[in-house]
């Protein structure tokens, strides 16, 4: 099932309860969708450990010495453009819709259908040096768990490491990782249903919130995030005077949820996303954009209609983004950063382990294809330069 739903919550207004019913409706939808969320990190980890020795045999010289074009199998979450392949200078990209692809494994040869049901064959023994796997938003799907296990076990280069994608897809684990390396991020706390079910929940909840601002004030604004949301889903802002009631309402629907509550920064000139490749100690900046919120929404997700433009990082900002990307262990990620107007410091907002192409919504099919093609040309060129 496609998970391209959008949470239309707008709880950023002073009167948060005006739109609370919208949030509850969409929250219920997310809960229903959770039954499709599947992870098997133990199986993936075992596969990675079993393949560790084989991976070491894939040397840089082997990648550099190939006499064929590299084939990039791009598992996109859904079919977004009417194209099956795109030929770059050194790479042929084959687009596969990970939510609807069919596959068959016989004699160590994996057969998968692309967007237009053309059969793509991958020899898990002989194609290891000329095929790279890029799975965007595929790690939460049953079939993709199986496929990625097979590719990783065989020793293919897989973007991204399944063990690391689990961390980046969980906002709390990401926050803990940033803490481990003392990387600037908004002050935060994690809240569970038990925190709201005490004898004096108001008093106890204030103790939880106090470290974020150093005080408890009804006008303090907080960014609240469901841990596994993406694309702006499950993210809302509320004031201190409303936060306990709203959180209690969420837990009354699903008391197994955990909610990350963050300090709301005064973001200067929109946020910044740096697309960073990291491999064997080498790093490349694929591109960088700054995103502006749209329609009075505080979120800057392109999928929600925000605008963006190219952004030139300063040396300090580039060094910061590269350091964050390296610490995640991800081969490719989007590092979302912002500059706080009050402190003028650079902060990490989120780390995206499966960043989408920076292409605006609402384009014609022809222009949409053109801009995606330009991005993938740039991406594959950077990818090949870092693999050599």
Short names for language-model regions:
Residues 34, 41, 47, 53-58, ...:
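Active-site nucleotide/adenylate-binding loops and adjacent lid/helix of ATP-dependent enzymes
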Residues 38-48, 60, 308-312, 326-330, ...:
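C-terminal active-site "lid" helix and adjoining low-complexity regulatory extension at the edge
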Residues 222, 284-287, 345-350:
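Protein kinase-like catalytic core scaffold
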Residues 18-31:
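Hydrophobic alpha-helical signal peptides and transmembrane signal-/tail-anchor segments
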Residues 13-14:
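Acidic/polar hotspots within intrinsically disordered regions
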Residues 67-69, 78-197:
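Conserved N-proximal alpha/beta basic substrate-recognition cap immediately N-terminal to
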Residues 219-220, 228-320:
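Phosphate-binding site of ATP-dependent enzymes
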Residues 262-263, 272-273, 330-342:
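A short glycine-rich, hydrophobically flanked beta-strand micro-motif that places a catalytic Asp/Glu
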């Amino acid at each position: 099932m496609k998970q391209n739903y959008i949470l239309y919550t707008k709880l950023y207004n002073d009167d948060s309860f005006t739109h609370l019913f919208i949030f509850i409706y969409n929250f219920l939808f997310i809960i229903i969708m959770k039954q499709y969320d599947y992870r098997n990190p133990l199986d993936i980890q075992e596969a990675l450990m079993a393949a560790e020795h084989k991976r070491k045999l894939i040397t840089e010289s082997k990648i550099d010495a190939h006499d064929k074009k590299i084939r990039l199998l791009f598992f996109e979450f859904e079919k977004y453009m009417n194209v099956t392949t795109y030929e770059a200078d050194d790479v042929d990209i084959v687009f596969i819709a990970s939510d609807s692809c069919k596959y068959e494994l016989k004699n160590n040869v994996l057969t998968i259908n692309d967007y237009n049901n053309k059969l793509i064959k991958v020899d898990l023994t002989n194609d290891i040096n000329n095929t790279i796997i890029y799975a965007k938003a595929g790690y939460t799907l049953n079939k993709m768990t199986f496929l990625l296990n097979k590719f990783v076990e065989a020793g293919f280069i897989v973007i991204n490491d399944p063990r690391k994608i689990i961390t980046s897809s969980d906002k709390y684990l990401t926050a803990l990782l940033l803490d481990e390396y003392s990387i600037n991020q908004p002050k935060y706390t994690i809240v569970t249903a038990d925190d709201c079910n005490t004898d004096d929940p108001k008093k106890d909840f204030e103790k939880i919130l106090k470290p974020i601002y150093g005080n408890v004030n009804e006008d303090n604004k907080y960014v609240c995030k469901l841990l596994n949301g993406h694309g702006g889903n499950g993210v809302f802002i509320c004031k201190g005077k409303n936060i306990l009631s709203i959180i209690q309402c969420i837990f009354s629907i699903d008391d197994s949820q955990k909610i990350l509550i963050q300090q709301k920064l005064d973001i200067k000139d929109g946020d910044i996303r740096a697309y960073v490749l990291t491999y064997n100690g080498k790093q490349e900046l694929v591109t960088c954009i700054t995103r502006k919120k749209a329609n009075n929404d505080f979120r800057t997700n392109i999928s929600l209609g925000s605008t963006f433009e190219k952004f030139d990082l300063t040396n300090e900002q580039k060094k910061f983004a590269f350091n964050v990307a390296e610490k995640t262990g991800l081969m490719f990620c989007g590092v979302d950063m912002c500059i706080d107007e009050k402190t003028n410091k650079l902060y990490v907002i989120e780390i995206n382990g499966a960043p989408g192409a920076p292409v605006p919504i609402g384009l014609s099919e022809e222009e949409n294809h053109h801009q995606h093609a330009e991005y993938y040309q740039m991406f594959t060129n950077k990818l090949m330069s870092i693999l050599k």
